[in-house]
Amino acid sequence: MSSKMAAQTAASTAAAPMGREQWSLLLLLSVLWGGSFLFVGIAIKELPPLTIVLVRVGLAATLLAPVLWMKGLALPATMAAWLPFVIMGALNNVIPFTLIAFGQQTVASGLASILNATTPLFTLIIAHIFTADEKLRSSRFAGVLIGIAGVGVLMGPEAIAGRTSSLLGMSLCLAGCISYGFAALWGRRLRSTP
């Protein structure tokens, strides 16, 4: 990427201050996303991991289809147009949901959510390696560490102890976080897509 393109990309992605609506949506997302670890932890006792992933993705697709229709958007018509979305769906949903569901067979929900809090850290590292305009700075790194510590404090020492957690289960959860990081990088390609 040329320095001119990097400068244009950085300028076009400069963040505007978040308003009440954005903060409300972020809070809703946090509740929904955070609650998923609890529900997966409950479901994993009765259902196989891939069934849980299928139900999550199928339910989301069913709920989002009317939103697509209400916004007047159409599904892509060609395989070439579908490909970027298939890649995004794999990186941001199928791969991490599958890895985390398998990981939660031996990892408590609280610990899984703390491990998931490492997603911004992996995203920073991936962006630093693969982009010209998203380099790792000490302030970003410190912010991520404070965020991870905050999640740990909120979840409590019992979640961190993870007495029944296996190294494989924790590694699967972390691999899911790495996939989320690559999804964020891939999502940069889809910025202009509604």
Predicted regions and their residues:
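Glycine-/small-residue-enriched transmembrane alpha-helix faces in small-molecule transporters
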Residues: S2-L54, F102, G162-R189
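Hydrophobic residues within alpha-helical transmembrane segments
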Residues: S24, L28, L54-L59, L83, ...
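Specific transmembrane alpha-helical segments of multi-pass solute transporters/efflux pumps
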Residues: L32-V40, A65-N116, V153
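Membrane-interface helix caps of multi-pass small-molecule transporters
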Residues: I42, P66-W69, F102, T106, ...
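C-terminal transmembrane-helix exit sites in multi-pass transporters
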Residues: L63-L75, P120-L145
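Hydrophobic transmembrane alpha-helices of multi-pass small-molecule transport proteins
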Residues: L64, V86, I126, S138-E158, ...
